């Protein structure tokens, strides 16, 4: 498979995952109700069992279509997708999950192109009329199309897939689906198979039989743990600590990406994964195991929670035996590899780069020093993975703890999905090497580092050392701001200083426009900006709300208004009664911080502000205090 095609398939999997994952809690809730109240459940109840059918028939497809439309064109796309999928639901007799994955995005695209075409053609004063009626009309039209065409087509496709699956089961071929699934997982293509095929088939099967084997095919942690355990016994000593962590994360955290790098270091281990998975599927078929809903993440805890009454032994047996098969095969393959890497007539083993994982440690050290500009100040680091919820979250947590132990408080470490990486405001992006090309396409301005393993402890140690040496040297050109009061003053080179004159407590306003004008006026009065910057701040707010969440808003000017900025500075305003700053009624800001930053100085300024306000207790204190010195103290306490 070519690289561009691989990226396309990964993107498709990411999009399917983005439709399913936000709604996974609903499927879990449905599984809990099913496990409790169906005839074979823990507390059989025919009355409460009646809620299962409406949820699976109506709620699942509508939620998925809503999410799919929202991903393409926000709320308007979500509404059209939700309306349209009803047509497909009532035209068929099967759960319309696959149809929802198609109809939802179609609704989003239709509204997107309609909005694009009509953007400058609606007369002033008719915007609300056009917006409301266009969504209703487009939704009705797509509903008719779904009812007449898309629904019946999806039903035929589902019947065909069901026929193929039954054919495989009757001919004892279903276990061999592992030949496709296990290699696909290693190359981050599992979301396409899992959410595009196995998940819809699983829901259809559960409706009929109150359980499905398809929910346990991809989520079975046994084969992956088998590979990790084999590495633990036959790998080199200095990776055993990370392997212990990987095994715990794989088993209880359900993050399967953890074992991918260990397989890629010795691709022959894919055979162990395949054989382990085949064994597990075979046991589930013979003993009729399965789950009542999706186990997400693929943790042993999730699997046990979604196991129907009476099937605990069967499901655990399938997981354990698949682990043993994978472990034994992996041990044999690693022993063969070790034997092949001994020098003939000597007891000295040659540790080749393409075999031992610890050989990647030295590569990481060299990579960090050669890839990063020693004069660049790194303040915002993002770990990215395909979905942004598994391995990247683990990696971000590891680095965050390390830099915290080193008393580094002015660097932000976060995680994100590849396709959610912002195209500005990021200094360093770290990904698995198979995803680095996609990350570079999302943001070509930031520095990029590639990892073989997200549990490579040596990498984090070297990166932490680099950050200390290059970002915290007193002689380096750190872009920062200090907090000045009688007891606190930083002698470092600063972008600006926060003083009592920048802080306004107990303010009252009737609208966010009034707030922005007040802040803009203070920026002008204190010599930070020219008069024109006030209108630029209002213009920027019309483009998109500067509401950040957690009671905070950060109004600033447009990119074009940088010529109106004289000096970098902020104005801190407190509104105890709150001001509506976002699009939703709940988006109330109590802390409004106006920003004016020259050149690229907005990046460290915003990063530092968000670092300070990353604690709910700090936000609460700043929202109610009546003493300016309290604000100065809370800012200075964060060592900014």
Swiss-Prot record:
Residues at the site labelled Stabilizes the transition state in the phosphoryl transfer from HPr to EIIA: 540
Record-annotated PTS EIIA type-2 domain positions: 496-638
Catalytic activity: D-mannitol(out) + N(pros)-phospho-L-histidyl-[protein] = D-mannitol 1-phosphate(in) + L-histidyl-[protein]
PTM per Swiss-Prot/TrEMBL: An intramolecular phosphotransfer takes places between His-556 and Cys-385.
Domain PTS EIIC type-2: from-to ranges: 12-343
GO cellular component: plasma membrane
Disulfide bonds: none
Residues bearing PTM Phosphohistidine: 556
Any single GO BP term: phosphoenolpyruvate-dependent sugar phosphotransferase system
Cellular location(s): Cell inner membrane
Cross-referenced Pfam families: PTS_EIIA_2, PTS_EIIC, PTS_IIB
Domain of life: Bacteria
Record-linked CDD domains: PTS_IIA_fru, PTS_IIB_mannitol
Active site (record annotation): 385, 556
Membrane topology, record value: Multi-pass membrane protein
Keyword annotations of the record: Cell inner membrane, Cell membrane, Kinase, Membrane, Phosphoprotein, Phosphotransferase system, Sugar transport, Transferase, Transmembrane, Transmembrane helix, Transport
Written domain comment of the UniProt record: The EIIC type-2 domain forms the PTS system translocation channel and contains the specific substrate-binding site. The PTS EIIB type-2 domain is phosphorylated by phospho-EIIA on a cysteinyl residue. Then, it transfers the phosphoryl group to the sugar substrate concomitantly with the sugar uptake processed by the PTS EIIC type-2 domain.
Name by which UniProt lists this protein: PTS system mannitol-specific EIICBA component
Provenance organism: Buchnera aphidicola subsp. Baizongia pistaciae (strain Bp)
């Amino acid at each position: 498979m070519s690289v561009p095609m691989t990226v396309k398939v990964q993107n498709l999997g990411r999009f399917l995952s983005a439709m399913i994952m936000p709604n996974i809690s609903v499927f879990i809730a449905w599984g809990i109700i099913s496990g409790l109240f169906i005839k074979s459940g823990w507390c059989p109840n025919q009355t409460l069992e009646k809620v299962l059918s409406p949820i699976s028939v109506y709620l699942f497809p509508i939620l998925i279509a809503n999410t799919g439309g929202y991903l393409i064109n926000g709320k308007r796309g979500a509404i059209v997708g939700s309306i349209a999928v009803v047509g497909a639901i009532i035209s068929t007799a099967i759960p319309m999950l696959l149809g929802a994955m198609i109809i939802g995005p179609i609704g989003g695209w239709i509204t997107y192109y309609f909005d694009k075409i009509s953007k400058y053609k609606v007369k002033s004063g008719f915007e609300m009329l056009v917006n409301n009626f266009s969504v209703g009309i487009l939704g009705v039209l797509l509903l008719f199309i779904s009812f007449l065409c898309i629904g019946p087509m999806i039903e035929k496709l589902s019947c065909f897939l069901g026929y193929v699956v039954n054919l495989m089961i009757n001919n004892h071929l279903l276990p061999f689906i592992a030949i496709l699934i296990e290699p696909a997982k290693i190359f981050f293509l599992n979301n396409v198979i899992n959410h595009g095929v196995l998940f819809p088939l699983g829901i259809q099967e559960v409706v009929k039989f109150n359980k499905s084997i398809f929910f346990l095919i991809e989520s079975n942690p046994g084969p992956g743990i088998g590979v990790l355990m084999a590495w633990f016994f036959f790998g080199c000593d200095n990776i055993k600590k990370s392997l212990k962590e990987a095994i715990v994360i794989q088993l209880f955290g359900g993050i399967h990406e953890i074992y991918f790098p260990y397989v890629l270091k010795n691709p022959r281990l894919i055979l162990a994964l395949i054989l382990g998975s085949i064994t597990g599927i075979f046991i589930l078929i013979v003993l009729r195991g399965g789950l009542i809903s999706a186990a997400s993440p693929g943790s042993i805890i999730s699997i046990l929670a979604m196991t129907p009454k009476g099937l605990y032994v069967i499901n655990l047996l399938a997981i354990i035996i698949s682990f043993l098969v994978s472990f034994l095969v992996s041990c044999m393959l690693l022993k063969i590899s070790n034997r092949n890497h001994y020098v003939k007539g000597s007891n000295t083993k040659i540790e080749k780069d393409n075999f031992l994982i610890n050989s990647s440690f030295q590569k990481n050290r060299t990579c960090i020093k050669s890839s990063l500009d020693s004069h660049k100040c790194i303040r915002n680091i993002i770990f990215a993975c395909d979905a942004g919820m598994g391995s990247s979250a683990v990696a971000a947590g590891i680095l965050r703890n390390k830099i915290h132990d080193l008393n580094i408080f002015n660097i932000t470490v976060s995680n994100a999905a590849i396709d959610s990486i912002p195209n500005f405001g990021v200094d360093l992006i770290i990904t698995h090497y198979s995803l680095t090309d996609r990350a570079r396409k999302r943001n070509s301005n930031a520095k990029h580092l590639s990892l073989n393993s997200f549990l490579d402890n040596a990498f984090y140690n070297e990166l932490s050392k680099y950050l200390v040496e290059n970002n915290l040297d007193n002689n380096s050109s750190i872009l920062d701001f200090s907090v000045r009061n009688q007891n606190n003053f930083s002698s470092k080179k600063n972008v600006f200083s926060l003083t009592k004159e920048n802080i306004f407590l107990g303010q009252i306003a009737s609208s966010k426009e009034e707030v922005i004008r007040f802040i803009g006026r203070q920026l002008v009065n204190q010599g930070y900006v020219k008069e024109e910057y006030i209108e630029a701040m209002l213009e920027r707010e019309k483009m998109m709300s500067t509401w950040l969440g957690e009671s905070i808003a950060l109004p600033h000017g447009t990119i074009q208004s940088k010529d109106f900025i004289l000096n970098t500075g902020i104005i801190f305003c407190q509104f105890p009664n709150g001001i509506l700053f976002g699009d939703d009624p709940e988006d109330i800001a109590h802390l409004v911080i106006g920003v004016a930053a020259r050149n690229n100085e907005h990046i460290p300024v915003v990063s530092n502000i968000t670092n300070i306000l990353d604690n709910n207790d700090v936000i609460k204190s700043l929202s109610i205090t009546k003493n300016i010195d309290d604000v100065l103290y809370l800012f200075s306490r964060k060592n900014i």
